[in-house]
Amino acid sequence: MSRMKQKYNDIVPALREECGVQNTMQTPKLEKIVISVGAGEEGRDSKLIANMADTISLIAGQKAVIVNAKKSVAGFKAREGAPSGIRVTLRGDNMYNFFDKLVSIALPRVKDFRGTPRKGFDGRGNYNFGLQEQLMFPEVEFDNIIKTHGMNITIVTSTEDDKQAFTLLEKLGMPFAKGRN
C-alpha cells in the first residue's frame, strides 16, 4: 500500500467528523488525477509532441495519450486530426503515488513557492491548478527536454462540495496558499 493511501486511511475518521458525514461511503476520497498539456504551436512538430508525451509518461508513471483535434479551427490554426495535446488519467495506486510525489517532492522544489491557489475549485468538488514547467519532478532530466512546458493537473474527488474537497486535500498534505487567493 502506498504511503499516501495509508495516510488517507489514517485521516478517514477525522475527515468524517469534520465533514459531518454519517455514512462511511460518503467520506470524500480521491477518484482520479488527470494531467494534461496543451500542444499549442508545438502541435505541428511531431518530435516535440513525442518528447512531451514521454516526459508526461515519466512524471505520471503511466503511458500518456496524444489527443487530436476533433475539428479544424482557423483562429487557432488547428487542423482536424492534428495533435492538440497530451493527457494521462491516473487512478488507484498510480494516483496515490503521483499525489505523494507532487506534494512531498515536486511542489517544494518550485522556486518561490507559496502554495497552490485556493480558487482552483470548480464548484463540484474538483480542484484544478497549473504548473509552469516540468523540471520540478525528479524523473525529468534537463538534458532530455527539447522545450520546457507547463501542465494542468485536475484532482477529481468523490464529493460535490468544495469545502469537503478542500478539507480532504488539506489533510492529505496539499500546500494551499495562505489568504484568500
Curated annotation (Swiss-Prot):
- Give any Gene Ontology cellular component: ribonucleoprotein complex
Single GO MF annotation: tRNA binding
Q: Where is the signal peptide?
A: none
> One biological-process term from Gene Ontology?
translation
Q: What's the superkingdom here?
A: Bacteria
Give the keywords, sorted: Ribonucleoprotein, Ribosomal protein, RNA-binding, rRNA-binding, tRNA-binding
**HAMAP family with a match to the protein in the record:** Ribosomal_uL5_B (MF_01333_B)
Question: Which PANTHER family does this one have?
Answer: 60S RIBOSOMAL PROTEIN L11-RELATED (PTHR11994)
Quaternary structure, per UniProt, is: Part of the 50S ribosomal subunit; part of the 5S rRNA/L5/L18/L25 subcomplex. Contacts the 5S rRNA and the P site tRNA. Forms a bridge to the 30S subunit in the 70S ribosome.
Summarize the protein's role.
This is one of the proteins that bind and probably mediate the attachment of the 5S RNA into the large ribosomal subunit, where it forms part of the central protuberance. In the 70S ribosome it contacts protein S13 of the 30S subunit (bridge B1b), connecting the 2 subunits; this bridge is implicated in subunit movement. Contacts the P site tRNA; the 5S rRNA and some of its associated proteins might help stabilize positioning of ribosome-bound tRNAs.
Instruction: Tell me which family the UniProt entry assigns to this protein.
Output: Belongs to the universal ribosomal protein uL5 family.
Q: What is this protein called?
A: Large ribosomal subunit protein uL5
**Organism expressing this protein natively:** Sulfurovum sp. (strain NBC37-1)
